[in-house]
A protein has these predicted regions:
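Phosphate-binding P-loop
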Residues: 82-91
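Interdomain "pre-motor" coupling segment immediately N-terminal to P-loop NTPase/helicase cores
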Residues: 1-46
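Walker A/P-loop nucleotide-binding motif
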Residues: 90-108
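Structural motif
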Residues: 155-157, 189
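Walker B catalytic acidic pair
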Residues: 160-161
Length: 235
């Protein structure tokens, strides 16, 4: 049977330019995803206005850098602020790393909040959800829908990389996503609890090499903030 293709024009279907979804339509889809995932409610509380340095010690120092935990956090905060401020004028990627609960996810939420407020398309995934989406996209009939968001959003945030079940598919898809977004000059933020020296073993040398040469490494240090909040009565 001869397969027919119908290209919908802008006049035929609102939200489309030719056969492609227009920016406003993509943003509406992303807005719906945020509403369904409850992330919009989270971002009301987790943004730059609510970032606190009180959870970071101003006496504990990193011997290698000579910085206290609080100074390290302030440096990360300033980098995140600069990332948002210069987002439209420069291409940059961030790699947030450090132990569990030191504020990596909170900081990425701060960035997501401000860029969404300025009408940018931001896709935010836990590593598990991202690779599940890519697997569904790869093995479903509509192979491009998931990748469209992953490759084309203004900013892609991959949270908690290393907590997913890692296999050859995950490793190859991570490299593909990172490389494709670099080629398209689309910014990406990755957060992970993995130590840098273990990253290549978990994924691959070429993936870490691509990250090391194209991402700004941002470390956060300190005690688990979630545990601190429990002792402080949730404050």
């Amino acid at each position: 049977m001869h397969r027919q293709y119908h290209f919908v024009s802008d006049a035929e279907a609102p939200g489309y330019v030719g056969s492609q979804k227009c920016t406003c339509f993509k943003k509406a889809e992303i807005e719906l995803l945020y509403t369904q995932s409850n992330l919009k409610e989270i971002l009301k509380k987790e943004n730059f206005d609510h970032f606190s340095f009180d959870y970071y010690s101003d006496t504990m120092k990193n011997e290698a850098t000579g910085l206290t935990e609080r100074e390290t956090a302030r440096r990360a905060y300033d980098i995140a602020r600069g990332f948002v401020r210069n987002f439209d004028s420069s291409f940059e990627n961030l790699f947030l790393y450090g132990d569990t609960g030191v504020g990596k996810t909170f900081l990425s939420h701060c960035i997501a909040h401000d860029l969404l407020e300025s009408a940018h398309c931001v896709m935010y995934f836990s590593a598990f959800d991202l690779f599940e989406l890519l697997a569904d996209s790869k093995f479903s009939r509509d192979k491009t829908e998931g990748q469209e968001f992953v490759f084309d959003s203004d900013l892609l945030i991959i949270d908690d990389l290393g907590t997913e079940l890692t296999n050859s598919f995950v490793s190859s898809q991570l490299f593909l996503g990172i490389n494709e977004r670099i080629m398209r000059r689309k910014s990406t933020i990755i957060s992970t609890n993995l130590k840098l020296e273990n990253f290549s073993d978990t994924y691959s040398e070429r993936t870490f090499s691509r990250i090391a040469s194209n991402y700004r490494m941002v470390k956060l240090e300190g005690k688990d903030i979630r545990i601190q909040k429990i002792f402080l009565g949730g404050k």
